[in-house]
Amino acid sequence: MKWKGRRQSSNVEDARGRKVATTAGAGVLLNLVGRRFGIKGILVLIVVGFVLWKVGLIDPSMMVGGPTQTQSVPVEATPEEQERFDFVTVVLADTEDVWKSELGRHGQPYPEPTLQIYRGRTQTACGAGMAQMGPFYCPADQKVYVDLGFYDELERSFQAPGDFAQAYVIAHEVGHHIQTLLGTSQKVAAMRGGPDYNEYSVRLELQADYYAGVWAHHNQRYLDTGDIEEAIRAANAIGDDAIQGRTKGRVLPHTFTHGTSEQRMRWFNKGLQSGRIEDGDTFSIPYEDLCGQFPHLNLALPSSAFRQSSYSGLGAGSLCHCSGGTSFAVSGSAT
């Protein structure tokens, strides 16, 4: 991908030097008092703490364990890490340009998300964020969170190397920001706990893949040979069936929340071909039609690319089956 020397987004928060910790506070103190003086000692401590709090001599957070605290330390980044940092800021800038234009076609503004780069652990408006979660978007603070170490995992464990594979991940998370702006995410979140929630979660994720494809469509002038293949490999590698097959040795379609490899490749490619937000409605079509046939691009994809035939007892298309056929009218259009 041709990215060096191009505009970098200013909506980037470098949190790599932040150390996040939760104060142990009362938990440790109550444990010590309980061991030494028993329940009576604990009761006395609580009463004393309450009195001191009422007269303003202590912060109440000291008695409940305290809030999450952060401490900043100097950032020491390798040249490779700093290059990745610069790269994702350019990718974010590209998404800003694309979505400002695309939503503008429909007369809507584009409030830009913030990208936070962190290491290991961070605090978000959606709760604690950890590197093990991979990149994610928090609708409560409208931020995308990325630990740059994930890209090593993407290359090593998911066999999806390349800078455009990394860009696809950012574009997918920004797709969730678009869904938040349009109200789609909120409607799906309201169904949490319902019998068909997983189905709508898959639809939501596939639409974010579609939006990543829309971004790629409008950035083709910056692509190198093989970039699209990198994104397709990444979409293939992080399908629910691919991940379950790799980690569990079997596939459980009813537990899918993000879509199969074939579905994710298909909807990214659909967005790439269209380039229009209004063609990405994954909610009004029957669930089984989310599959379709992904066009072969003569790629040297891993054998997991079309995994349906890899599992005994699963017929063609069965990985796309989900019980329930509830109508859910959510438009992917900004109009």
Spans of features found by a protein language model:
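Pan-zinc metallopeptidase signature
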Residues: 239-307, 311, 318-319
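A metal-dependent hydrolase signature that marks the N-terminal structural subdomain at the beginning
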Residues: 51-54, 58-127, 292-334
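Active-site recognition of the HExxH zinc-binding catalytic motif
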Residues: 99, 168-181, 209, 213, ...
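Catalytic zinc-binding patch centered on the HExxH motif and its immediate surroundings
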Residues: 121-147
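Catalytic Zn2+-binding segment of zinc metalloproteases
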Residues: 174-189, 219-220
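Short pre-active-site segment immediately N-terminal to the catalytic Zn-binding motif
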Residues: 150-168, 199-200
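Long amphipathic alpha-helical segments used for membrane anchoring, targeting, substrate engagement
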Residues: 1-76
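Short helix/loop segments within enzyme catalytic domains
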Residues: 79-110, 115, 196-199, 203-244
